[in-house]
Amino acid sequence: MFDPKKFIDEAVEEIKQQISDRKAIIALSGGVDSSVAAVLTHKAIGDKLTAVFVDTGLMRKGEREEVEKTFRDKLGLNLIVVDAKDRFLNALKGVTDPEEKRKIIGKLFIDVFEEIAEDIKAEVLVQGTIAPDWIETQGKIKSHHNVALPHGMVLEVVEPLRELYKDEVRLLAKELGLPDSIVYRQPFPGPGLAVRVLGEVTEEKLNICREANAIVEEEVKKANLDKDLWQYFAVVLDCKATGVKGDEREYNWIVALRMVKSLDAMTAHVPEIPFDLLKRISKRITSEIPNVARVVFDITDKPPATIEFE
């Protein structure tokens, strides 16, 4: 039986020993994994830790503001926010292969972290890597940017949650007193919306994806299903379909909805979702977001599918 209090005590001591009197930075996304890793590390080394949030331009709506409010204002962590939108989007121009996208994003993250580390004289990079991340990477299912790190990286990596699964991390978050908005926050892929925009990442598709995800999250929460579902999100497919706007033909993007239940992300199943909820989401996406012709719902379990499309 997992004992969160015991784990916290042991992890804090282990982090102290690993980092010692050196400075460290942590890659902070605002999700539960990196948040727990940040609080544990802060308990261990205090102000020798600097949290770094990289605004890649691939984040959810309001993500940056939420991170600043929670970690700088409420939790009092040293927080650096890096605006790297142009850098990431330029590097992704013309790239359609999902593994290539993940590798480009992973390399850019490390470049940014190493630059910050050099500025503040940090020697250690703390990450919120959990067990499913490295299991999927080793199994060559898909690369996780926080596992497939580039050779020659100068920072030493510390991963206090490496052997844990998401349900255990949530128990730690509760024990550490993190707000419910973080404890129950649904998992979000490290490469962000880049893997929810199939094919080439463009500003148009990113904007559609960001707005569609905001609508899905809002409607699922209104239906009180947010704590019941493991993940619920929207994906912009790399193809278009014919639709009708007024009396005119249109040829625009297809948005796919994905909603699954899971305990640890190693397997997942699609539950029966109220049809009126799906209809509401579809109506809002097609009426509120320009250039969307159609909304579809993915009913594939994991396996054979993965939870994310890319």
Curated annotation (Swiss-Prot):
It catalyses: XMP + L-glutamine + ATP + H2O = GMP + L-glutamate + AMP + diphosphate + 2 H(+). InterPro entries: GMP_synth_C, GMP_synthase_B, GMPS_ATP_PPase_dom, NAD/GMP_synthase, Rossmann-like_a/b/a_fold. Its EC number is 6.3.5.2. It holds the Pfam family NAD_synthase. GO terms for cellular component: cytosol. Pathway: Purine metabolism; GMP biosynthesis; GMP from XMP (L-Gln route): step 1/1. One of its GO terms (molecular function) is GMP synthase activity. Residues 2-185 form the GMPS ATP-PPase domain. ATP binds at S29, G30, G31, V32, D33, S34, S35. Catalyzes the synthesis of GMP from XMP. HAMAP family: GMP_synthase_B (MF_00345). This is GMP synthase [glutamine-hydrolyzing] subunit B. It comes from Methanocaldococcus jannaschii (strain ATCC 43067 / DSM 2661 / JAL-1 / JCM 10045 / NBRC 100440). The lineage of its organism: Archaea, Methanobacteriati, Methanobacteriota, Methanomada group, Methanococci.
